[in-house]
Amino acid sequence: MADIIGGEVVTELVRQLYAVSQKTLRCRGIAKNLATMIDGLQPTIKEIQYSGVELTPHRQAQLRMFSETLDKCRKLTEKVLKSSRWNMVRQLLHVRKMENLQSKVSSFLNGQLLVHVLADVHHVRADSEFRFDRIDRKVDSLNEKLGSMKLRGSESLREALKTAEATVEMVTTDGADLGVGLDLGKRKVKEMLFKSIDGERLIGISGMSGSGKTTLAKELARDEEVRGHFGNKVLFLTVSQSPNLEELRAHIWGFLTSYEAGVGATLPESRKLVILDDVWTRESLDQLMFENIPGTTTLVVSRSKLADSRVTYDVELLNEHEATALFCLSVFNQKLVPSGFSQSLVKQVVGECKGLPLSLKVIGASLKERPEKYWEGAVERLSRGEPADETHESRVFAQIEATLENLDPKTRDCFLVLGAFPEDKKIPLDVLINVLVELHDLEDATAFAVIVDLANRNLLTLVKDPRFGHMYTSYYDIFVTQHDVLRDVALRLSNHGKVNNRERLLMPKRESMLPREWERNNDEPYKARVVSIHTGEMTQMDWFDMELPKAEVLILHFSSDKYVLPPFIAKMGKLTALVIINNGMSPARLHDFSIFTNLAKLKSLWLQRVHVPELSSSTVPLQNLHKLSLIFCKINTSLDQTELDIAQIFPKLSDLTIDHCDDLLELPSTICGITSLNSISITNCPRIKELPKNLSKLKALQLLRLYACHELNSLPVEICELPRLKYVDISQCVSLSSLPEKIGKVKTLEKIDTRECSLSSIPNSVVLLTSLRHVICDREALWMWEKVQKAVAGLRVEAAEKSFSRDWLDD
């Protein structure tokens, strides 16, 4: 398969098409459409490549014909890029040829040939057991990944995992620590890596919790010399204490073979580096190594030594000078103690931290801008909290717990709630805000301020999608991460006391069943306000009855393609926020959804990677639901029924988010009957072509976000009748070529984002947008908006850097 359609060839072709769209005005729309269509093929091509199944001659011939079409397209883009933009005759000729190629590619896609090829692959694999180094990979995962796991830029979720360590930190950066104690370690590990090709294939970094192992590993993954040595073939993965080894192994195998000819071919000895962070056991490591692939080096990062001691770097604690410099960076934003401040106090606090980077950062942030008198109390608390056994890890725990004493109750509770989420996973900021809003009756902005405060204290990290550059448009673009030691502290503090009396009932890691401790104590009610359950597949028989009369937040994490909801939800009369997240590879079917009939107080519902249950006219309305988020879901026919009145089922809905739902074709017109809707966010839904014509009924709508809806070709003119609309995002809607002519009637519009659209002109009425304060556009469209800027006082026009990039795939 790789001989027929090469993944790197397709990647390069997409790059060239985007380059053409920027250079040649006449080819812009066609080139962008072609790039989107061809780019969307890549996950499917990779699935076929990795399957290891030999295609029939007939299928190979069909794919070879398509490959020839792509090759013609590549040659044409090269000609366009080399041609002069002033040669109009040649440009017209190129446009016609490109239109012809677009027709051929579209015909291929409409025929859904690749889907049939995948079906062939599945039939073959169903008849013979697929083995590769003792892996049993699920056959249906390929089909599910193909349709359901697309991310911005049409990337599959599997490949998107590679971005986990490439995010841009908003509040704190690990890079600030480098040069403070890590340079030596970086140099030593690089020496071992560069020699590894001669013998050792497994290199190690070990050290205690909070010593900076992950920071060092991240920096090595970004290091130019390391990337150059391995030809930019570097993969960083976090394994964690309860890993999905099958999924991780499939991901590593895909990475190792993506540069080669295919599964069954002989692989040349090109260098590749796989960095495995937070590995807990040798058994896990053994299952994630591919010793039979030449040129592969594995760098394992763990608390214990899992590699030979000769090629393991033990992360050293910081000496007094290094520790003082890191501490001062955290508290004073400089490496030295400021003149006039007590050197003695700084020395005492640094001494209590015993050279531990995490302690120095967290404690330093807690003392920022505090008077010296406060520092004296901090020294006393740190000294008092030091545990008797003097182990480094328990000392870190005690020191962090001491800093939490100074947090106000809501901020401290927010920190403790983070223990409800799985280890080493990015937490969508939207989810965390929803939980805090319901627990403490906060406004969204106030909840966000609490989270930022924790970030300023180095108790969590805010990260945003790297493909947005320095700008972001909503909470959905931002995620929360937390050091595993900090999460352990949150769990430890939450699990004090008898299980029935805990305010937070949490499972520390994924288990096959509910904790035995819960079952032994289920003869009396639980007082928990927050309940978090993390399992695999659950059937009706796996649940036992629980009384949770005070529970306001329920978070269900699982990894399976089917899942029976816990029956005790029906008795949770105070439940206001429900989060259901499937971490598996394919959307799950939920069973016993009828329990929702008793959730009268539910205000926030987050569904991720599940099949949305079918709604009908008999569905019991969720009278108080304010926020509904459908992420990576299969909509199926849930919203397509003409007789279904969505407004009756969700009468008070104010915030609707639908993201990465690739089978969403349209929004039902009855959704416009929800007069309380304040925000609609439809993002990364490539098949939706139009919006309801009766949008003007949404009198409360302030935010309309339509990011990366590639087939959306127009905005309804009714949008001009929305009396409160403030923000419109149509970025990466590549088929959208114009704004409504009467857009100037939206007097309340304050911000519009048009990045990577195909706008060739803007209506004259735009100058009437007197409230417009911010426009984000491409550099090529800057001249159009600068004319508007002269007519609209106070308008700021910002040209965004291109977010389209494939460099992050190598991270």
From Swiss-Prot:
Domain spans labelled NB-ARC: 180-242, 312-437
Pfam families membership: LRR_14 (PF23598), NB-ARC (PF00931), RPW8 (PF05659)
InterPro entries listed in its UniProt record: AAA+_ATPase, Adaptor_Cbl_N_dom_sf, Apaf_helical, LRR_dom_sf, LRR_R13L4/SHOC2-like, NB-ARC, P-loop_NTPase, Powdery_mildew-R_dom
GO MF: ADP binding; ATP binding; ATP hydrolysis activity
Keyword Transcription part of the UniProt annotation: no
CDD domains (alphabetical): ABC_ATPase (cd00267)
Top-rank taxon: Eukaryota
GO biological process: cell surface receptor signaling pathway; defense response to bacterium
Gene3D superfamilies: Adaptor protein Cbl, N-terminal domain, Helical domain of apoptotic protease-activating factors, P-loop containing nucleotide triphosphate hydrolases, Ribonuclease Inhibitor, Winged helix-like DNA-binding domain superfamily/Winged helix DNA-binding domain
UniProt keyword RNA-binding, yes or no: no
LRR repeats mapped onto the chain: 650-674, 676-699, 700-722, 724-746, 748-769
Domain RPW8: start-end pairs: 1-147
Keywords: ATP-binding, Leucine-rich repeat, Nucleotide-binding, Plant defense, Repeat
Residues forming coiled coils: none
Binding site for ATP: 207-214
Family, as annotated: Belongs to the disease resistance NB-LRR family.
Domain note: The LRR repeats probably act as specificity determinant of pathogen recognition.
Protein name per its UniProtKB record: Probable disease resistance protein At5g04720
Lineage, uppermost ranks: Eukaryota, Viridiplantae, Streptophyta, Embryophyta, Tracheophyta
